[in-house]
């Protein structure tokens, strides 16, 4: 196990990471064991839950005063979403699925007893679309729009359309990440015309605070995977009928337990590291 936790360069090797074959060979070279097979190495690694052959990307959030301020404002909205809704103010999260590929595949072989579903690997591309999703936090309901282009002009055009659909509201607290279309001057100019929109930004590299990311996963797994579209128009029509069905069958407020109190405790622990 100690060998697997060391970098290969420590043993004079220029490979970037260990495989079970490499570890077996090096263990014998170092005299740790007289003989050992890669299979036995894999069993040992499995027992201690060590996976030197795997990696995962991550990005450290910058824990500064701006992070804390933005997180507090977002979490306050989540904690008060129902109370605000009763007063005529919605908390709405927004996010995009950019450049979603429109892929046409051969007919799927549906699952039968003893055989899982099979999907043809080859496909024909029919371009991409940009999908904008709105999540109404206190109900879990969603709305969806297709943007012809992912930029500020198309973004605030869809914001204006959302406002027209909900003109009876007093205002919206809009949770969003720091995407360029969200932070552009044209978008801020649109917001400045009225207090109806009350934008709240997630901290840099902390878009996971936007509950719309949960919606993308919940909606996408049911309506965007394991299927095929012959054209852009066919996919758009599919989306038009899919999001109302999602609201009818699956929508519910997402469970969110991270409060401002918990965030401040977490911040105090990690900001000092």
Regions found by a protein language model. Give the residues of each.
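Electropositive, glycine- and tryptophan-enriched low-complexity nucleic-acid-binding patches
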Residues: 111-170
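C-terminal domain-tail junction helix/linker
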Residues: 104, 234-273
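Active-site proximal helix-loop segment of RNase H-like, two-metal nucleases, encompassing DDE(D)
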Residues: 142, 212-234, 245-247
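RNase H-like polynucleotidyl transferase catalytic core
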Residues: 118-124, 193-211, 227-229
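Acidic/histidine-rich, metal-coordinating catalytic segments
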Residues: 169-183
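Charge-mixed, compositionally biased segments that are often intrinsically disordered regulatory tracts
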Residues: 2-10, 17, 21-125, 272-273
